[in-house]
Amino acid sequence: MKKLLIASLLVAASTLAHAAGESITVYKDPNCGCCSAWIEHLREAGYKVKPVDSGDMAAVKKRLGVPESLESCHTGVVDGSGQVVEGHVPATALAKLIAAPAVKGVAVPGMPSNSPGMGKMNGKLVTVDFAGKQFSKD
C-alpha cells in the first residue's frame, strides 16, 4: 500500500512539473474580476498566461467548440496542444489535461463558489471533459 501511495505521489508531481511553464491564452470579458483571479491562480501554479480581452465571448466559445451546456465566463487554450479549458478549472486539472493530449477540452460549468478565482476549494470541485464525463475532482 505504501509503495502504491509513493508511486501515485510521484506521478502527480511529475504531471505538475510537466505542466509548469506551459503557456495558455485566456479569452475573457474585460470587466470580469473572477477571470483575473483565475489567471492569477494559474500563474501561481507556474503557467505562463496571456490574457486576451473580448467583447464577444459567445463567438470565442463557438469558434473553440465549447459545448453550450458547459459554458462559463472565460475560455483558455493551451498554446502547445490547442486543448480548451472552460471556466474555473483548477491548475491540477489543467496539468492532467496537458498530460492527456487525446482530451480536446475540460470545463467547470457555471461559476461554482468552491473553484479557483471564486472561492476556497474544498476537494469537491468536479471538472468534466467536453462529453460531460467527470475528468477530475479537486
Language-model regions, residue ranges each:
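Conserved helix-turn-beta segment immediately C-terminal to the redox Cys motif
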Residues: I39-A58
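Local sequence-structure signature of Cys/Sec-based thiol-disulfide redox active-site neighborhoods
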Residues: H18-A45
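Thiol/selenol-based redox catalytic cores and closely related redox-interacting motifs
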Residues: R63-D138
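Soluble non-cytosolic domains of exported or imported proteins
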Residues: D29-S36, P51-G55, H88
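Short active-site oxyanion
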Residues: S23-I24, Y47-V49, G80-Q83
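Hydrophobic h-region of N-terminal signal peptides that target proteins for export
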Residues: L10-A19
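Positively charged n-region of N-terminal signal peptides that target proteins for export
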Residues: M1-L4
